[in-house]
Amino acid sequence: MEKRWWKESIVYQIYPRSFKDSNGDGIGDLNGITEKMDYLKKLGVNVVWLSPVYQSPNDDNGYDISDYRAIMTEFGTMEDFDRMLAAAHEHGIKIVMDLVVNHTSDEHPWFIESRKSKDNPYRDYYIWRDGKDGKEPNNWGSCFSGPAWDYDEETDMYYLHLFSKKQPDLNWDNPKVREEVFDMMNWWLEKGVDGFRMDVISLISKQPDLPDGKPGINGYASFNEPANGPHVHEYLQEMREKVLNNADTITVGECSGVTLEEAKKYARSDEKELNMVFQFEHMDVDADADNKWTDKKMDLREMKAVLTKWQKGLEDIAWNSLFWENHDQPRSVSRYADDSAKYHDVSAKMLATCIHMMQGTPYVYQGEELGMTNVPFTSIDQFRDLDSINAYRELVEEQHVFTAEEMMRYLCCKSRDNARTPFQWDDSAYAGFSTVEPWIMVNPNYKEINAKKQIDDPESVFNYYRKLIALRKEKEIIVYGTYDLLLPESEEIYMYIRTLGEEKLLVVCNFSEKEVAVEIPEEFRKGSYLIANYPKGEIKEQMTIRPYEAFVLEK
């Protein structure tokens, strides 16, 4: 397998609004990131993926961009960005920009022009259609509730928005749109950024006839209906030729709804398109078929089957991204393990062991390395996330699918705002994130869970992450070894083997609070511990795996 720097990297995702406020306005900013570069260096990560910092009206927290070559005023200036970029590079950290080009803001100059008239030069930059029988052109739903179409009186037509009404979809079939996007990407590369995380990139090519899809719980087809459209690979290959080959970049595509076969096309080892994709099949293990709003717990057997499918399916063909968390997902220690005081630390370390020992590039979301947890929200008024607020309005107030109590329970489990509360730096007011009340509430457990408390504690979750990250840099087998699952039918234990030549590692993780007896494969019984989240027991044929225990044995 060809060795590449991005296969050996550890990526840290920063959600700037919630990372560090440097100027006392309650909102995180670029200077706050620059201020904390030493922290990132200490953790050991070598790439930072920055959620959008471009000019935006902030309908969807920066994923609605009105100017791709300007910085959102709340986050600072272009000079602040340049200073942050230089500081990152001085610390040996690369910067990856969030590229949001499936859609723009409705306040982008292109859309302002596009909606003026049917013959405007920018009309075809977006997807406009006539209505059908006085209704929307098809039954596609928006990711944020309601239809994916909005009627525009000015020209008596509908425009497509797979996300909010303020996020109209670009028409990638128009070569001028592609040229504009490629030109903008080259501009950022010339500035010195090191790559792109491509937001919902699998949605950019729509089927020309925009066919209806299967309706879900709210009567609309999924926003994912256009995923992996007819020209998506052609457009990404064009992007590779016109942009990505101009520099030694790292690229990852967010590919919601992607199949294994499609992923092989997006992230083939011949590097014609992207380096890797984010697939979300493992994020759907605890969802209902047609509804994500649930408090259903995952079945570990299904989780193992999904992750194993991707580990084996991409082996020697394409490259995996490894993650439990991002800005759109709840906190993993609350979701997949146990965030109670008794098991919090071992749970967070177990989850980290499980995912970081697989083949692929690991992504750590801010606060994950501390074991930050879901938030005990008590009222819909505490939420800031468009998705959560719209879903509450639609499913509770309008359609009465759920009661208010049910929906609050589901939001506390699944809302994106669980990941977006301020980073917990210390136990001072507002968790050391800001000197004033932040834009969203601070998780009340910040006095127990914070960076200051963990950095100097050798047994902390933070220092366990440091060890995992250091091991990945030191041991080629963790990056390049093959993966083989053991005990597929166990409901508690996730156990797998990594192999590279004569080297072998055994990874054992208990996803339950039970003590579980496990037989250790013979070849590891005379081995040694590489890492463990409990005091190390004697390695023998039969071992009792303690609640949320994780360890790695080296042959």
Where are these regions (language model features)?
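Active-site and adjacent substrate-binding regions of carbohydrate-active enzymes
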Residues: 1-528, 532-555
